[in-house]
């Protein structure tokens, strides 16, 4: 069995594309992709190492498939799981809600005792507010803006994967 589960929700295809890039850099020999719209509680419980891709829609909302999955997510005990988060948002048109969906998922995971890794610097992002902030210098996970900074996406993914992969290899 592959040891890292990469779960994503995607309406436009951006988050799915990013999930596939993350899988490419981690290695498809050790990771599996799951669309959250076709995911069961057991699918997540089968992995100790998880990556969740959560885009933000409109005014800070969780993408519709993730929104449908939230009641199930709230039931899962994450105490023996390591979880990394990535998300997509638009820092210009939705500057006051930038990647808020990551904050929503983070709160559920923390409440359910997940070990969350993969914080990402806020440097070079321009937004007013975000519920995805660990503090003023870091987001809870990798934040990507395919609308305004698509040219930085692949570099950011490579750097983030380098940061998180040791956690998956040593636990």
Curated annotation (Swiss-Prot):
Cofactor: FMN
InterPro entries per UniProt: Flavodoxin (IPR050619), Flavodoxin/NO_synth (IPR008254), Flavodoxin_CS (IPR001226), Flavodoxin_lc (IPR010086), Flavoprotein-like_sf (IPR029039)
GO terms assigned for molecular function: electron transfer activity; FMN binding
Domain Flavodoxin-like residues, every copy: 4-165
Alphabetically ordered keywords of this record: Electron transport, Flavoprotein, FMN, Transport
Source organism, top-level taxon: Bacteria
Pfam family, one: Flavodoxin_1
Its biological purpose: Low-potential electron donor to a number of redox enzymes.
Record-stated family: Belongs to the flavodoxin family.
Protein name per the record: Flavodoxin
Upper classification of the organism: Bacteria, Pseudomonadati, Pseudomonadota, Gammaproteobacteria, Enterobacterales
The encoding gene: fldA
